[in-house]
């Protein structure tokens, strides 16, 4: 019985490369001369450092641009609040989201059941397994999910016949 998994996962290697490119651009840009602006990464947590709110916005824009160039969807980023650290300096923690959340998984299952396509959906951890008897049904399910779920980037992998 053909099946595939619906997941939501950023390519962390590309995220790391985008951070390195962002730091390189920040270190060479004229408007950041003499400032302590940078992006640091610990696992799935990115920390943006800057001298003030304006420069923090600039750092964020550089990072988003580099992520977009490396085909990493910016909807994976979950921004924390801006915190003041010593003096005028500020930092912001950005989390890279992973996995299909419980609410989104339920929404996907509901969409699949309401679509009247002859497939079954089951929640398996942080993924949703879609299985059906015909490959065409699975492909139409993928098209329907791409159209209807716009708030979170979805990937479709583990396609089996």
From Swiss-Prot:
Entries under Gene3D superfamilies matching the protein: YajQ-like, domain 2 (3.30.70.990)
Protein name, as recorded: Nucleotide-binding protein Bcen2424_2555
UniProt GO cellular component terms: cytosol
Lineage: superkingdom: Bacteria
Species whose genome carries this gene: Burkholderia cenocepacia (strain HI2424)
Database matches in InterPro entries: DUF520, UPF0234_N, YajQ-like_sf
Function (record text): Nucleotide-binding protein.
GO MF annotations in UniProt: nucleotide binding
Family: Belongs to the YajQ family.
Keywords: Nucleotide-binding
């Amino acid at each position: 019985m053909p099946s595939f998994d619906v997941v939501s996962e950023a390519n962390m290697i590309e995220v790391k490369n985008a951070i390195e490119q962002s730091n390189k651009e920040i270190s060479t840009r004229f408007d950041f001369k003499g400032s302590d602006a940078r992006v640091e990464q610990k696992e799935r947590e990115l920390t943006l450092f800057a001298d003030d709110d304006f420069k923090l916005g600039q750092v964020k824009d550089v990072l988003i641009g580099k992520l977009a160039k490396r085909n990493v969807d910016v909807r994976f980023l979950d921004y924390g609040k801006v915190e003041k650290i010593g003096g005028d300096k500020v930092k912001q923690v950005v989390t890279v989201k992973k996995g299909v959340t419980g609410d989104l998984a339920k929404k996907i299952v509901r969409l699949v059941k309401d679509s009247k396509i002859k497939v079954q959906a089951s929640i398996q951890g942080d993924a949703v397994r879609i299985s059906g008897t015909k490959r065409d049904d699975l492909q139409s399910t993928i098209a329907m999910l791409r159209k209807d779920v716009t708030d979170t980037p979805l990937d479709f992998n583990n396609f089996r016949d």
